[in-house]
Swiss-Prot record:
UniProt function note: ATP-dependent specificity component of the Clp protease. It directs the protease to specific substrates. Can perform chaperone functions in the absence of ClpP.
Sequence positions that bind Zn(2+): C8, C11, C30, C33
Record-stated family: Belongs to the ClpX chaperone family.
Organism: Neisseria meningitidis serogroup C / serotype 2a (strain ATCC 700532 / DSM 15464 / FAM18)
Cited InterPro entries: AAA+_ATPase (IPR003593), ATP-dep_Clp_protease_ClpX (IPR050052), ATPase_AAA_core (IPR003959), Clp_ATPase_C (IPR019489), Clp_protease_ATP-bd_su_ClpX (IPR004487), ClpX_bact (IPR046425), P-loop_NTPase (IPR027417), Znf_CppX_C4 (IPR010603)
This protein's GO CC annotations: HslUV protease complex
Keywords noted in UniProt: ATP-binding, Chaperone, Metal-binding, Nucleotide-binding, Zinc
UniProt subunit comment: Component of the ClpX-ClpP complex. Forms a hexameric ring that, in the presence of ATP, binds to fourteen ClpP subunits assembled into a disk-like structure with a central cavity, resembling the structure of eukaryotic proteasomes.
ClpX-type ZB domain segment(s): 1-49
Domain of life, source organism: Bacteria
UniProt-recorded name of the protein: ATP-dependent Clp protease ATP-binding subunit ClpX
Disulphide bridges: none
GO MF, one example: ATP binding
Length: 414
C-alpha cells in the first residue's frame, strides 16, 4: 500500500488529514485516535501506567479491607471461632498491605504471614479460607495434602497446585502470584517417627520438603494451559514468593503430645485431673500448642518455620451447630427453605428438630460437615414427592422426624 492510500484503521482518516499515522502489523492508528484512547483511560481512573508493587507488578486497585471488616465478613459465613478469625484477618491484612506498599519496608525485610489452622473436622477451616479469598477477590485454590507426592512419583506433585491456581485466573500470572492456596489435611503427611526412614517416604516428609520450597518462595515452572510436562516445551514461570499459603488439619493425637509437655505426670496428689468434657480438654490444649509439639507430631521444623501464624479452632458444641444451621447467609435451613419456596411451600424446623440434628452431628464427630447429610436424609422422601403434592402449603419438621425417622407433617390448603 502506498503512503498516500494509508488510512487509520480506527477512524478511517488518510495520512494527509492527520499529523501522524503510526504503523503496526497490518494496521495503522492516527494521533487523534491515540489522544481519544488516553482520554478514555483517564476517565476510567487509569492513565495506562501501572503503579509499581512488589516484584515490579501492577498494584491492585480498590481499598484493602481492614481486619475488622474482614472479620465482619467472615461472621456472615462462619459461626464462632472468634480468635481464629482475628488471627486470619490480621495476617491476611498484613500480607496484602506488604504487597501494596513494598517501598515502606525498604529498610526492613517483611516476611510472609503464612497460616496454619488447627482444628477438628467440620470446625470451619476450609470455609474460613474460602470466605477470605472471596472477600479479597483474589484467586483461590484448594489442595489435599494426602494426594500429593514427591516429583517423579505417580500422583500429583506439588507444582500442580500452582497449575490449578493459574487455571482459576485464566492463566494470568500476575493474578496467580497474589492468590491464596489452602492445603488441607497437612497433618496427614507427618513423618511417622522421629528418625527419618531409610526407605523412600513418597507422601510424608518428602512432600513436606517439596511444599517447603513452594511456601517459602520459588519459581515454579508450569506447563502451558495445565498440560503435562514434556521435554523441550516452554513453561510458564510463576513466582510463589507472594502467594499466601494457608495449611489446615485436624491433628488427631496432637493433644497427647501437648499434654506430655505440659504435665509432670505422677500419682496421688501429683496426678493431673482432666475435665469430664474431652472436647473442652482438647480445645484448651490446642490453644497452647507450641512449634515443638508440631515437630514431635511429625512436621519438619523448616515447614513450621514457614507457617508463623498458628490459629486454633474450637470443637463446635450443640448451640454452635444450631446457629450454623440457621444464622449464616448460606445456612442450611435457609437453603432448603428457598428450595421449598420455589414450589410455593413453606418449610419449618421446630427447635427440637434442630437440636436433634446438632446432637447427631456431634455423635458422628463430623461437626458442621455432617449437618447436610442429616437434613437431606430426613427431607429426601418429601422433596421427591413435593412437585406432585397439589395444594401443599407447609412442611413441618419435628423432633420425631430426626430421631425416629417419621415423615414430616404436611399442611394442605383447606
Amino acid at each position: 500500500m502506498s503512503n498516500e492510500n494509508r488510512t487509520c484503521s480506527f477512524c478511517g482518516k488518510s495520512k494527509s488529514h492527520v499529523k501522524h499515522l503510526i504503523e503496526g502489523e497490518n494496521a495503522f492508528i492516527c494521533d487523534e485516535c491515540v489522544s481519544n484512547c488516553i482520554e478514555i483511560l483517564h476517565e476510567d481512573g487509569n492513565d495506562g501506567t501501572p503503579s509499581e508493587s512488589a516484584g515490579g507488578e501492577p498494584e491492585e486497585s480498590g481499598k484493602l479491607p481492614t481486619p475488622a471488616e474482614i472479620v465482619a465478613n467472615l461472621n456472615d459465613h462462619v459461626i464462632g471461632q472468634e480468635q481464629a478469625k482475628k488471627a486470619l484477618a490480621v495476617s491476611v491484612y498484613n500480607h496484602y498491605k506488604r504487597l501494596r506498599h513494598p517501598k515502606a519496608g525498604a529498610n526492613v525485610e517483611l516476611s510472609k504471614s503464612n497460616i496454619l489452622l488447627i482444628g477438628p473436622t467440620g470446625s470451619g477451616k476450609t470455609l474460613l479460607a474460602q470466605s477470605l479469598a472471596r472477600k479479597l477477590d483474589v484467586p483461590f485454590v484448594m489442595a489435599d495434602a494426602t494426594t500429593l507426592t514427591e516429583a517423579g512419583y505417580v500422583g500429583e506433585d506439588v507444582e500442580q497446585i500452582i497449575t490449578k491456581l493459574l487455571g482459576k485466573c485464566d492463566f494470568d500470572v500476575e493474578k496467580a502470584q497474589r492468590g491464596i492456596v489452602y492445603i488441607d489435611e497437612i497433618d496427614k503427611i507427618s513423618r511417622k517417627g522421629d528418625n527419618p526412614s531409610i526407605t523412600r517416604d513418597v507422601s510424608g516428609e518428602g512432600v513436606q520438603q517439596a511444599l517447603l520450597k513452594l511456601i517459602e518462595g520459588t519459581v515454579a515452572s508450569v506447563p502451558p494451559q495445565g498440560g503435562r510436562k514434556h521435554p523441550n516445551q516452554e513453561f510458564i514461570n510463576v513466582d510463589t514468593t507472594n502467594i499466601l499459603f494457608i495449611c489446615g488439619g485436624a491433628f488427631a493425637g496432637l493433644e497427647k503430645v501437648i499434654r506430655q509437655r505440659t504435665e509432670k505426670g505422677g500419682i496421688g496428689f501429683g496426678a493431673s485431673v482432666h475435665s469430664k468434657d474431652e472436647n473442652a480438654d482438647i480445645t484448651k490444649l490446642f490453644g497452647i500448642v507450641e512449634p515443638e509439639d508440631l515437630i514431635k507430631f511429625g512436621l519438619i521444623p523448616e515447614l513450621i518455620g514457614r507457617l508463623p501464624v498458628i490459629a486454633t479452632l474450637e470443637e463446635l458444641d450443640e448451640d454452635a451447630l444450631i446457629n450454623i444451621l440457621t444464622e449464616p447467609k448460606n445456612a442450611l435451613v435457609k437453603q432448603y427453605q428457598a428450595l421449598f419456596g420455589m414450589e410455593n411451600v413453606e418449610l419449618e424446623f421446630e427447635e427440637g428438630a434442630l437440636r436433634s440434628i446438632a446432637r447427631q452431628a456431634m455423635e458422628r464427630k463430623t461437626g458442621a460437615r455432617g449437618l447436610r447429610s442429616i437434613v437431606e436424609r430426613c427431607l429426601l422422601d418429601t422433596m421427591y414427592r413435593l412437585p406432585d403434592l397439589k395444594g401443599l402449603k407447609k412442611v413441618v419438621v419435628g423432633k420425631a422426624v430426626i430421631e425416629e425417622g417419621r415423615e414430616p407433617e404436611l399442611v394442605f390448603e383447606p
